[in-house]
Design a protein with these regions (language model features):
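C-terminal ends of transmembrane helices
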Residues: 57-70, 117-127, 201
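C-terminal transmembrane helix-loop-helix hairpin of multi-pass membrane proteins
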Residues: 133-210
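Intrinsically disordered, low-complexity non-transmembrane regions of multi-pass membrane transporters
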Residues: 1-14, 204-210
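Short amphipathic alpha-helical coupling elements at transmembrane boundaries
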Residues: 15, 62-66, 131-139
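Hydrophobic core segments of alpha-helical transmembrane domains in multi-pass membrane transport
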Residues: 30-34, 50-55, 82-89, 111-115, ...
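Transmembrane alpha-helix boundary signature
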Residues: 87-102
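Cytoplasmic-side transmembrane-helix entry/capping segments in multi-pass membrane proteins
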Residues: 68-81, 102-108, 135
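Structural signature of hydrophobic alpha-helical transmembrane segments
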Residues: 40-56, 76, 100-111
Length: 210
């Protein structure tokens, strides 16, 4: 019997953080990366929210996998995800109202995130609850990692702040430094992601296409 963190389970958990990242390798979930990464805080909150939804949706679908009729499995998956997204939305309204307002409709649109349905279809329907939970955590954190990196650079270079705190010294501005207003525009998220993809593929030869 495999241990809770066997080599296979470690690969399931850690693979999405690097060589099988859902955003920069599988090209999933990019749309929300445009919308919520102009600042670091909403990027972190969205990353945590998606991680929670993917992990628990994976577990629920895995537990039900032998009882769900094949012809309605997509509907069941959507209902499970919608219920979890509703819970996450209410929690954010209760404990992080300002960030929830910044995220706006994009919390509700978690249900349309390709990563969610992709993991439910590709993994949870064919694996046990623990493996599915690890897969959800891994893919959620892989997604969150990219959002945080993009949000970090967009807020730092676009506003001179991180988490709302000024980090670029006033002396820089006195000498003529100007924030790059382009960084807070949605197209710059694509460009930052493209740079991350380039760096990632340069470091991982197995991802390079001939």
């Amino acid at each position: 019997k495999m241990g809770l963190l066997s080599e296979k389970n470690k690969e399931v958990l850690l693979g999405p953080l690097s060589v099988n990242n859902p955003v920069i390798v599988q090209m999933l979930g990019i749309c929300s990366a445009l919308a919520v990464t102009s600042k670091l805080e909403p990027a972190i909150v969205m990353g945590i929210s998606v991680t929670a939804v993917v992990a628990f949706a994976n577990v629920i679908i895995s537990l039900l996998r032998n009882t769900i009729p094949n012809r309605i499995r997509i509907i069941v998956q959507l209902v499970v995800v919608a219920a979890l997204v509703t819970i996450v939305s209410e929690v954010l309204k209760a404990f992080a109202y300002d960030v929830n307002k910044q995220l706006s409709v994009f919390v509700g649109l978690i249900i349309t995130n390709c990563i969610l349905m992709g993991r439910l279809e590709a993994f949870a329907l064919g694996n046990g609850p623990w493996e599915s939970f690890l897969d959800g955590i891994g893919n959620g954190l892989g997604y969150a990692l990219i959002l945080v990196i993009v949000g970090f650079f967009r807020e730092l270079l676009g506003s001179g702040t991180l988490l709302g705190f000024q980090v670029i010294p006033q002396a820089f501005y006195d000498f003529g430094y100007v924030n790059n207003g382009l960084m807070i525009l949605p197209p710059m998220a694509l460009i930052v992601i493209a740079v991350i993809i380039w760096v990632h593929r340069s470091r991982n030869k197995e991802l390079q296409e001939n």
